[in-house]
Regions:
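C-terminal ends and interior cores of transmembrane alpha-helices
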Residues: 88-107, 280-294
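Symmetry-related core transmembrane helices of the 12-TM Major Facilitator Superfamily/SLC fold
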Residues: 177-196, 375-398
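Helix-loop boundary and gating motifs at the non-cytosolic
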Residues: 5-60, 220-250
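Cytoplasmic helix-loop-helix junction between adjacent transmembrane helices
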Residues: 116-155
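Glycine-rich segments within core transmembrane alpha-helices of 12-TM secondary carriers
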Residues: 144-168, 336-349
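A late C-terminal transmembrane helix in Major Facilitator Superfamily
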Residues: 324-367
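Central cavity-lining transmembrane alpha-helices of secondary-active solute carriers
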Residues: 54-73, 252-262
Length: 406
């Protein structure tokens, strides 16, 4: 399948598959709610933006910590139990500090916040590696697995917009302090959905090393990994800039347009075109962001960004799947997840580090989510986008065409 014309099998959309897709959406939405939640409360407590960036970035480190044990855990124990335990730990991470602060008036320092984000990332990474890379595959036939990976990745991708949108709705109609309890409830919802799916028992392998790259990281995909990280870092810097509700709604609209474009615009397009167009769209969004007109900043920019991120994400996922050898599908999807999340997290963290004075533009605790666009962050993003385009066009794509296996 060299094009994006992924076949649709109606019988794939059974009840268990729906449950896993929405579990993926709820879980990742609970995580992306913290894009606004963490800066808001840390700024309220007097932390500097660089400290906010470090706390946000710690998640990107955490997602790698338990990946090497994933293969052992899903074979030593029932794979759905591993996923459920991981999601449960994510839910606890969402609410534990909030609970101790609100009901026991226990304050935690910067180091504890960093450690908690690392732990959250570790269990979220394990949950994703078992859910999207293992359990989803177990619910479908072998000829449907590429389609299943493609669909479930889209549910996770939508969370980039649904998480911040939900926080804005909480802020508008309720109170920002409900952000973490709501994230906790979403994670519990994901846990319930996964628990409702029945999985057959699979006998473990005879020899199971405690640590391995299986279901964790695809070594032969390092060029793809680096390229994705650079692309998503440039896009991630946009999320370090304060935006209003309209922006995130338009970002969601851009992602929806990307789904439609993949089906009708890129269905029979050249293999290279999708990533190139996506990078051009991201670059255009960054360029238009320099404009001070409200329509351009609040509507056009997020639509272009969402469209670019959407078409790039789907194409690179398929690249990873085609690069994998026999029985490495789960490993390839996990590697894509790691690259995607690491890139976005690094971009957001770098954005906060670069805008150390951002919270001083408007007084008060709401400044972190109501500030105007900070143009200085766009220039490094544009440089990363240009570098990513050159890297993909002249190095990564020719390398991929030479090394793909499917």
């Amino acid at each position: 399948m060299d094009t994006q014309n992924t076949p649709i099998h109606v019988n794939l959309w059974h009840r268990d598959f729906w449950r896993l897709c929405f579990a993926n959406l709820l879980l990742m939405t609970s995580v992306y709610m913290l894009i606004l939640g963490i800066p808001y409360f840390m700024t309220k407590e007097g932390y500097r933006p660089w400290q906010v960036g470090v706390v946000v970035g710690a998640y990107g480190l955490g997602i790698f910590l338990l990946g090497g044990f994933c293969s052992y855990l899903v074979q030593r124990y029932r794979r759905n139990r591993v996923c459920q335990f991981s999601i449960c730990c994510v839910a606890v991470c969402h609410v534990v500090l909030y609970y101790l602060d609100t009901f026991w008036n226990i304050k935690f320092g910067f180091e504890v916040l960093v450690a908690m984000r690392v732990v959250l990332g570790a269990f979220l990474g394990l949950a994703q590696m078992t859910l999207a890379s293992t359990l989803v595959i177990d619910t479908c036939e072998s000829f449907q697995r590429t389609e299943a990976n493609y669909i479930t990745s889209w549910f996770a991708r939508f969370s980039i917009a649904t998480g911040p949108v939900l926080v804005w709705l909480i802020c508008t109609f309720f109170n920002m302090r409900l952000t973490f309890p709501v994230a906790f409830l979403l994670a519990l919802g994901a846990l319930v959905l996964v628990s409702r799916v029945k999985f057959p028992f699979k006998a473990p392998a005879d020899h199971m090393p405690l640590f391995s790259s299986d279901r964790f990281f695809l070594p032969q995909g390092i060029p793809l990994f680096v390229n994705i990280v650079l692309i998503m870092a440039s896009a991630g810097m946009y999320f370090a800039i304060p935006h209003n509700l309209t922006v995130y709604l338009m970002l969601l609209a851009g992602l929806v347009v990307a789904v439609i474009a993949e089906k009708y615009v890129f269905a029979d397009a050249d293999l290279k075109s999708q990533v190139v167009v996506g990078l051009i769209l991201i670059g255009a969004a960054e360029f238009v962001s320099l404009n001070d007109q409200d329509f351009a900043v609040e509507v056009l920019v997020p639509v272009l960004l969402g469209l670019g991120m959407g078409v790039i994400g789907s194409r690179f996922l398929l690249f990873y799947i085609k690069l994998a050898k026999h029985c490495q599908r789960g490993t390839s999807t996990s590697s894509f997840f790691l690259a995607w999340e690491l890139g976005i997290t690094l971009g957001i963290a770098l954005g906060f580090v670069l805008q150390d004075s951002a919270c001083q533009h408007l007084p008060g605790e709401h400044s972190v989510i109501f500030n105007s666009t900070i143009h200085e962050l766009l220039y490094p993003g544009m440089i990363l986008t240009g570098l990513s385009l050159i890297l993909y066009n002249f190095l990564v794509h020719p390398w991929y065409m030479k090394h793909r296996n499917r």
